[in-house]
């Protein structure tokens, strides 16, 4: 299971209402953080609107995972869910002045481009 916190991309800070880790049995959660504050998208009327919340971050995370799975499929790479999550964690962006993993950002901010850069190194 992938668990994402959500953050404000303009301020580069975790949202006050975003969940924090760790779990009761000390597993590291969240795995990473995804954008979730004032994210622009299109509504049912075709208008651009800004939305915020954990559901926005979940949509971005799901979309990133779908793109990642499509790429893996096209390249004949078979990974299980745990391996995919670990590669996303490996590609997460990290601030230099912060220790990771931590209770707010997990292993960092979701960065699909950086995940692909890490895969190229293998």
Q: Predicted segment positions?
A:
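Zinc-dependent metallohydrolase catalytic domains
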Residues: 103
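Catalytic-core environment of secreted peptidases
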Residues: 6-59
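Hydrolase catalytic cores
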Residues: 36-100
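Substrate-binding/active-site groove segments that recognize
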Residues: 30, 110-111
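Divalent metal-coordination and catalytic microenvironments
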Residues: 32, 64, 106
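Secreted peptidase-domain scaffold signal
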Residues: 112-122
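Loop/turn elements at helix/coil->beta-strand transitions in domains of secreted/extracellular proteins
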Residues: 1-2, 28, 83
């Amino acid at each position: 299971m992938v668990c994402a916190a959500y953050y404000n991309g303009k301020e580069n800070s975790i949202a006050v209402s975003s969940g924090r880790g760790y779990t009761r049995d000390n597993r590291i959660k969240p795995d990473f953080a995804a954008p979730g504050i004032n994210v622009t998208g299109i509504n049912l009327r075709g208008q651009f609107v800004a939305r915020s919340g954990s559901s926005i971050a979940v949509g971005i995370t799901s979309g990133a995972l779908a793109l990642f799975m499509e790429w893996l499929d096209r390249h004949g790479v078979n990974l299980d869910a745990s391996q995919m999550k670990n590669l996303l964690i490996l590609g997460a962006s990290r601030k230099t002045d912060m220790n990771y993993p931590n209770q707010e950002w997990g292993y960092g901010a979701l960065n699909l481009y950086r995940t692909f850069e890490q895969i190229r190194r293998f």
